[in-house]
Amino acid sequence: MAGVLRSVFQRPPGRLQTVKKGAESLIGTEWIRHKFTRSRIPDKVFQPRPEDHEKYGGDPQNPHKLHIVTRIRSTKRRPYWEKDTIKMLGLQKAHSPQIHKNIPSVNAKLKVVKHLIRIQPLKLPQGLPTEETMSSTCLKSTGELVVQWHLKPVEQEAKS
C-alpha cells in the first residue's frame, strides 16, 4: 500500500488524475460478493398440486375465503426481504394471529415466508358476523370465529 501511495505522489499531476479515474471504477459494486441474493424459485412451486389438497385437507372446488396467519419463528438472521414481507403482513409480533384474504397476491407473499408462519383456514360455523356482532366475536385456536351472543335480561311483569 505504501508503494502505491509513493508512486502516486511522485508522479506529475496529469498522471494523478488517471489514477483517480481508475480508482473510481473500483468503487462500483460489480466485484463485491453480496451476502444475500434473492432465491430463484421456479414457477412450478407456486402452482397448486392435487397432492397438496390430499396432504393438508381442503376442497379445491370450494376453497376457504380467509386465512389465519400466525408467525411462529423469529425473523432474526433472516434476509431483509423476508423481514419486509413479515412487516407488510402485520406479523411483527409472534403468536398473534392476523386474518388475510385467500387471493393470489397475498398467497405469493405468504409463500416467501412460509417457513416462518402457520396458515390455517378461517372457519365460520355461525356465518359472517354483522357490524353489530363484530365486537362480540371470539377467534379460537382451532381457527373458528365464534359469535358470542349477549343474553338480554328478561323483563319481569309487574305483579299486582
UniProtKB/Swiss-Prot annotation:
InterPro entries: Ribo_uL30_ferredoxin-like_sf, Ribosomal_uL30_bac-type, Ribosomal_uL30_ferredoxin-like
Transit peptide: 1-34
Subunit architecture: Component of the mitochondrial ribosome large subunit (39S) which comprises a 16S rRNA and about 50 distinct proteins.
Entry's Gene Ontology BP terms: translation
Stretches for region Disordered: 45-64
PANTHER family: LARGE RIBOSOMAL SUBUNIT PROTEIN UL30M, MITOCHONDRIAL RIBOSOMAL PROTEIN L30
Keyword Ribosomal protein listed: yes
CDD domains linked to this entry: Ribosomal_L30
Name of protein: Large ribosomal subunit protein uL30m
GO MF annotation, one: structural constituent of ribosome
Compartment(s): Mitochondrion
Organism listed in the record: Rattus norvegicus
Family in the record: Belongs to the universal ribosomal protein uL30 family.
An annotated GO cellular component: mitochondrion
Domain of life of the source: Eukaryota
One Pfam family this sequence matches: Ribosomal_L30
Keywords tagged on the record: Mitochondrion, Ribonucleoprotein, Ribosomal protein, Transit peptide
Keyword Mitochondrion: yes
Record lineage: Eukaryota, Metazoa, Chordata, Craniata, Vertebrata
